[in-house]
Amino acid sequence: MDTTKAYIEIVIPIDSIQLKGNLRHAENSKGIILFSHGSGSSRLSSRNNYVAYYLLKHGFSSLLFDLLTQEEDTIYENRFDIQLLTDRLVKVTKWIRENSETKHLPIGYFGSSTGAASALSAAAQLDDTITAIVSRGGRPDLAMPA
């Protein structure tokens, strides 16, 4: 099963940067799942792409995107800056809400590792915008204030 060809590459403008993403859009989509991946991972993760492909086959759209630019990812501390990751996820979620193709879809988060912490924090900030959160091997403890 080739899970890498089922998406379109997009660029999401966030403040002064652009985040790269892979959007899979299901026909008659039931919702869209935003992936908030963990430290050291990316939108190209074979594991997350498999999950996104599975979701597509079951009627869910998905967006795998990099929370950090390539330059930012070279700074190790950024991978654990939960506030930065949360801010990015909130802004991408708002972008999804403003996009004509996705604004009508219920939104869920799929977080792994440190991405689970940013998913929980972002969902708390966005009130009732997020309808579901999945944490796979997550670090929810990092979502709590220090």
Residue ranges and their predicted role:
Residues 2-10:
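Short, hydrophobic/aromatic-rich segments at coil-to-beta transitions
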Residues 2-3, 27, 100, 126:
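Solvent-exposed alpha-helices and their adjacent loops that cap or buttress functional pockets
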Residues 10-105:
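Serine-hydrolase catalytic machinery in alpha/beta-hydrolase-like enzymes
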Residues 89-146:
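Primarily recognizes the serine-hydrolase "nucleophile elbow" in alpha/beta-hydrolase
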